[in-house]
Amino acid sequence: MSDNETRIYDIVVIGAGPVGENVADRTRAAGLSTVIVESELVGGECSYWACEPSKALLRPVLLYGEAARFPGVGGAVTGPLDAEAVLKHRDRMSADWNDRDQVDWLDSARIDLVRGHGRLDGPRRVTVHTPEGGIVRLAARHAVAVCTGTSAALPPLPGLDALRPWTSREATSAREVPDRLAILGAGVVAVEMATAWRGLGAQVTLIARESRLLGRVEAFAADLVADRLREAGVTLHLGTTIDTAERAGGPDDAVHISLADGTRLVADELLLATGRAPRTEDIGLETVGLTPGEWLGVDDSYAVTAVDGEWLYAVGDVNRRALLTHQGKYQARIAGAVIAARARGLTLDTGRWGAHAGTADLEAVPQVVFTDPEIAAVGLTTEDAARAGRVVDVVDYEIGRVAGAIQHDPGYRGHARVLIDPERRVIVGATFAGAGVAELLHSAAIAIAGEVPIDRLWHAVPSFPTISEVWLRLLETYRDQRV
């Protein structure tokens, strides 16, 4: 194609991860011609370097731990995990880093794909530099959606290039188990990768500036995870950070690390799990009056607030509302509906919980941390409520007292907490920590998003004996607290 030709579509989507795919799916289903631009693999970070490969590494580790602890089974669990088999399983779950199936889906959905690096080139215009060195010019009649996600944010360590650190990408795609792995960070990536690689046989040291892990979840849940990591043999250095780190080079190529508290460590690999940065540095933001490299602020319809005309949307991690794949897909469904409605000249339903408002970003964001034990949370934490000045009733229960939990593991360790708005008598936050609690989470999300009254929840009968009976115990505890 000539550089001077312009392909015109109703919608142009930059970024073909799960978020971009869902925006494109919604707009194409609404009858709008849609093109999606991708510089790497269709399917994005989640499919190849985050959600899918990380959970493929974690599931065998968590299953092994549960089996080893269970009466009558533990004796049959001998020897270490077969790391080679686990890594092959990870490869299969990541489609061997081949996006053929995802491209086939785009074709079946009649969504056009342009491979290359897409940059805004003024209002409603995108220029794509293709891998072959060509240029494709695109124009949108109605909207451009930026769905470029995030990349690893690295700390300013001296000699970073020579250090050759792991980011989350290397941690989920490594071809062999390192003998010694050091991890800098206290968040989800840090604790999940500590769990996975320790289970696969690495000696793991986790270093965190914070005084505790997982600062955004309830403290009781983070403490349970920290205890299990220590029991598994992970060394935790909390309340400190890396002063210097150097890769020695030579035959061993080890990383020599000095901590701020004076501790010295040696590792074969260093994972820097220190947060995320928006992938907006080189997407042409300056051509529409925005600053490259910044997060893109949006309203509840995901239109970028700093750009007039309601034609530019930022969906998923890039808007910083909730850095989670499933929440980005939720945003994509809303944004796609908004774009389609505006293209047809329809009035938007932007009220709270309306069809064109991302209310869940503010009130009901679910997240699972796949550690031992699992953490599943949605809505407010007690710290969130305190910061917002909201009065809530806090209800706690030890999950290990539930019959279903004892059936799951006679030594079950876990805890549940719900936060209740005493005036409205609805749940506004829930956190569960324990084996198998991820599957409790959607019931909590429904209770919060549906604003189900506490009195109605008594009619939602949990099956016996299941871990979900903790819901009944929480209601009983709340009843007794109010007497």
Cite the ranges covered by each PLM segment.
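A Rossmann-like FAD-binding core segment of flavoenzymes
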Residues: 76-77, 112-115, 119-132, 200-300, ...
